[in-house]
């Protein structure tokens, strides 16, 4: 029976081979048995027609994944859809996938919105292997569900997978193109993002403001303000768009994020409309991130006069940690995003907070790294420290920032030369950025940092963002 089914698979047209392997896995009690027989039956010359490699087949992933959660649950009757929801809230993605298997065995199919929610979680915690399994569970029904899958792969740093989904879409709208452009720019591929916009225009599409916003973000990733300003001019010159305050804010953010604060202020002075609170808020945050505290404080005073409530809400979201007065949603984001580090093949997560001294070995390791950094000319950017204390104490406070502790912990608890990844819930400051460039040079490691805005890839003392963030 087994060999008969396998022989029939070979007669299927090429587009159906992938579906056939998935269907066959349900014909046997042992998924491992079905995978082994299919692998032996399908010749190597036919393997290239599969839309994904055979090892990504969901049945095979199920074979090699230890069902730890299923082993804990002796009675599968106690596993319900509420179990799945609870695991998703706890960001336990692998366990949630195991529950999907259990529910399917009981004849219950997890609904589409829940699967899309799980896809978003995969992108948030950068779980690429699990993301591919979730993708196998999803059959996108509309453009929005395709966008969710693209954003999932973007969060997992797999732009190739995202592009595959994009190219497979039967129909794309402007939001689709904007999503793909942001995906490439966020992952440090600004040139490809600009090329994607060029392709968008060449195919006869008309851009909207959201597309241009994505293009500005791509220009920041390559540090090309001239390209961005040309696109800004084309908005009203070539496409007749009526500019809003949000459009001006986007340009200001592009200029300031590229380090051109003088040009940003000149742009504000030349504007024909009165600057909004949002514009001053953008300048304030970017000044603080880049270490221009005095100028940022001036903008802060101006914001307080115009709208004091802005200073206690989302105005500081990109710079300071969430406050006690923030909403429950912000607390949930903090739970998911707060300084997590993967340091082993099992993808365990470790959380670090500023001032955390519970990992004595971590602090000691970073002090040792700091000595080596100072020897080759590193100068701590103490101007980003807001507390009015002596210079030495500022350096000490910078030492205990959560992202530095996370990298130090990973260095001493992982194999030599292995790339390291840190996720954080705030934008990185200039001191942290310079620190990680030096660490990548000293240790010979590739460091990957995802902050609130984008990815940073550090290698041999250089960052992929070219110091524009």
From Swiss-Prot:
Residues 1-65 form a transit peptide. InterPro entries: DYW_dom, Pentatricopeptide_rpt, PPR_At4g14850-like_plant, TPR-like_helical_dom_sf. PROSITE patterns: PPR (PS51375). It holds the Pfam family PPR. Residues 375-469 are annotated as: Type DYW motif. GO terms for cellular component: mitochondrion. GO terms for molecular function: RNA binding; zinc ion binding. Keywords: Mitochondrion, Repeat, Transit peptide. It comes from the Eukaryota. PPR repeats lie at residues 142-172, 173-207, 208-238, 244-274. GO terms for biological process: RNA modification. Belongs to the PPR family. PCMP-H subfamily. NCBIfam families: PPR. This is Pentatricopeptide repeat-containing protein At2g34370, mitochondrial. It comes from Arabidopsis thaliana. The gene is PCMP-H25.
């Amino acid at each position: 029976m087994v060999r008969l089914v396998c022989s029939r698979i070979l007669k299927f047209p090429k587009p159906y081979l992938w579906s056939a392997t998935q269907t066959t896995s349900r014909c046997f009690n042992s998924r491992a048995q079905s995978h082994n027989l299919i692998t032996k039956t399908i010749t190597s010359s036919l393997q290239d027609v599969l839309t994904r490699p055979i090892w990504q087949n969901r049945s095979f992933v199920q074979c090699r994944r230890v069902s730890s959660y299923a082993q804990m649950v002796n009675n599968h009757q106690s596993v319900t859809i509420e179990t799945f929801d609870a695991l998703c809230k706890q960001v336990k993605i692998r366990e949630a996938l195991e529950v999907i298997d259990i529910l399917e065995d009981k004849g219950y199919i997890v609904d589409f919105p829940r699967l899309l929610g799980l896809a978003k979680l995969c992108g948030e915690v950068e779980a690429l292997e699990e993301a591919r399994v979730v993708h196998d569970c999803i059959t996108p029904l509309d453009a929005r569900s395709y966008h969710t899958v693209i954003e999932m792969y973007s969060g997992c740093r797999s732009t190739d997978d995202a592009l595959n989904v994009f190219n497979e879409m039967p129909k794309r709208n402007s939001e689709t193109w904007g999503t793909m452009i942001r995906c490439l720019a966020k992952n440090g591929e600004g040139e490809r993002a600009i090329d994607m916009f060029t392709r968008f225009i060449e195919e006869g599409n008309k851009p909207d403001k959201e597309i241009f916003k994505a293009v500005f973000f791509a220009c920041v990733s390559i540090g090309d303000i001239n390209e961005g300003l040309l696109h800004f001019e084309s908005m009203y010159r070539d496409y007749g768009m009526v500019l809003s305050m949000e459009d001006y804010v986007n340009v200001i953010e592009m200029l300031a994020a590229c380090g051109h604060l003088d040009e940003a202020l000149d742009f504000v002075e030349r504007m024909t409309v009165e600057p909004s609170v949002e514009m001053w808020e953008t300048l304030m945050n970017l000044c603080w991130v880049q270490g221009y505290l005095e100028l940022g404080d001036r903008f802060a005073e101006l914001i307080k006069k115009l709208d004091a409530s802005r200073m206690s809400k989302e105005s500081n979201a990109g710079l300071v940690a969430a406050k006690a007065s923030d909403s429950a949603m912000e607390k949930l984001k903090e739970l998911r995003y707060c300084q997590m580090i993967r340091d082993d093949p099992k993808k365990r997560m470790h959380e670090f907070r500023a001032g955390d001294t519970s990992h004595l070995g971590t602090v000691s390791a970073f002090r040792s790294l700091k000595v080596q950094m100072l020897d080759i000319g590193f100068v701590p950017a103490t101007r980003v420290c807001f507390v009015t204390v002596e210079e030495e104490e500022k350096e000490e406070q910078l030492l205990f920032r959560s992202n530095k502790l996370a990298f130090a912990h990973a260095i001493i608890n992982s194999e030599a030369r292995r790339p390291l990844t840190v996720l954080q819930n705030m934008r990185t400051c200039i001191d942290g950025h310079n620190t990680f460039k030096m660490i990548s040079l000293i240790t010979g490691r590739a460091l990957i940092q995802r902050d609130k805005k984008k990815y940073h890839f550090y290698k041999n003392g250089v960052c992929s963002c070219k110091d524009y963030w």
